[in-house]
Amino acid sequence: MQNETRSLWPHKDLLDVDQLSKDELLHLLDTAAQFHEINRRPVKKVPTLKGKSVILFFAEPSTRTKTSFDVAGKRLSADTFSLAKSGSSLQKGESLKDTALTLEAMNPDVLVIRHSSSGAARFLAERLACGVVNAGDGWHAHPTQALLDCYSLRQVWGDTFEGRTLCILGDIAHSRVARSNVKLLTSLGVRVRLCAPRTLLPAGVGNWPVEVFTDLDAAVRDADAVMCLRLQLERQQAGLLPDLREYSNRYCLTPRRLELAKPEAKVLHPGPMNRGLEIASSIADAPASLVLDQVAAGVATRMAILFLLATRTDGGR
């Protein structure tokens, strides 16, 4: 497996999903499936990355993604080290570049970074010799979330993405998850619909390869899957949406609305959820929900990413 992977994986970094060819994407998902199977065993730890080191540099708050990467690294027997902005020299005025160069002097094999500035991961990848994984940069991209979402859908759909319809619902304007999912899923032939109040749709969305809706009933009709996004409550304070009750009345995914989708439609949510606001509790806990499947897929997918980058062909970008 390792020799084959080295011959197939040329990328030093994972910055966004559009850097991957279809063959590379499928190879990554197939690798994740192998790790997913390992994660179901009584003994989940494998020596695949023993002796490798992974630094988790989260300059923006995170619980789910950071924990998922930490678990992924440890299950591969890598040494993982966590650094948050509150405990780093960034708080003392040190530049991002100098902080990263200091970390690289410790010779990690992979640096996983989350940062509030769009482009931060690329900035580091262009300057550091170690592999860099973008765990979210501003509103720009969240490639590992899109990859685990794709993996979760593949578990249901198989490889028949072409012609499927996915509705992404919620705060699209400020969502790096939506942006990466649109890029990835449309490249596989999925028809993507975006649904949000006009104030939560991004500028230039008319140029995206999607259909845009402000009416949720129309957006979910005959969809194969619906992805709800977390509503960031500070958006109401900024005047970007009406009061929360009105938002819930118009944009909460309820059983009645899900019935408008196809009978076998699945529901996704990147978490954390605001139950009763963007998604009804009965839907979040229903058999149609893939929310917990996404969590399991996240560990397996991130194991695959760390493995592929840490054992990559030298010289790839």
Curated annotation (Swiss-Prot):
Keywords: Pyrimidine biosynthesis, Transferase. It is an enzyme of class 2 (transferase). L-aspartate binds at residues 92, 176, 230. Pathway: Pyrimidine metabolism; UMP biosynthesis via de novo pathway; (S)-dihydroorotate from bicarbonate: step 2/3. InterPro entries: Asp/Orn_carbamoyltranf_P-bd, Asp/Orn_carbamoylTrfase, Asp/Orn_carbamoylTrfase_sf, Asp_carbamoyltransf, Asp_carbamoyltransf_Asp/Orn-bd. It catalyses: carbamoyl phosphate + L-aspartate = N-carbamoyl-L-aspartate + phosphate + H(+). Its EC number is 2.1.3.2. The keyword Iron-sulfur does not apply. The keyword Signal does not apply. GO terms for biological process: 'de novo' pyrimidine nucleobase biosynthetic process; 'de novo' UMP biosynthetic process; amino acid metabolic process. One of its GO terms (molecular function) is amino acid binding. One of its GO terms (cellular component) is cytosol. Pfam families: OTCace, OTCace_N. It comes from the Bacteria. Carbamoyl phosphate binds at residues 64-65, 114, 142, 145, 271-272. Catalyzes the condensation of carbamoyl phosphate and aspartate to form carbamoyl aspartate and inorganic phosphate, the committed step in the de novo pyrimidine nucleotide biosynthesis pathway. Belongs to the aspartate/ornithine carbamoyltransferase superfamily. ATCase family. NCBIfam families: asp_carb_tr (TIGR00670), PRK00856.1 (NF002032). Heterododecamer (2C3:3R2) of six catalytic PyrB chains organized as two trimers (C3), and six regulatory PyrI chains organized as three dimers (R2). This is Aspartate carbamoyltransferase catalytic subunit. It comes from Nitratidesulfovibrio vulgaris (strain ATCC 29579 / DSM 644 / CCUG 34227 / NCIMB 8303 / VKM B-1760 / Hildenborough) (Desulfovibrio vulgaris). The gene is pyrB.
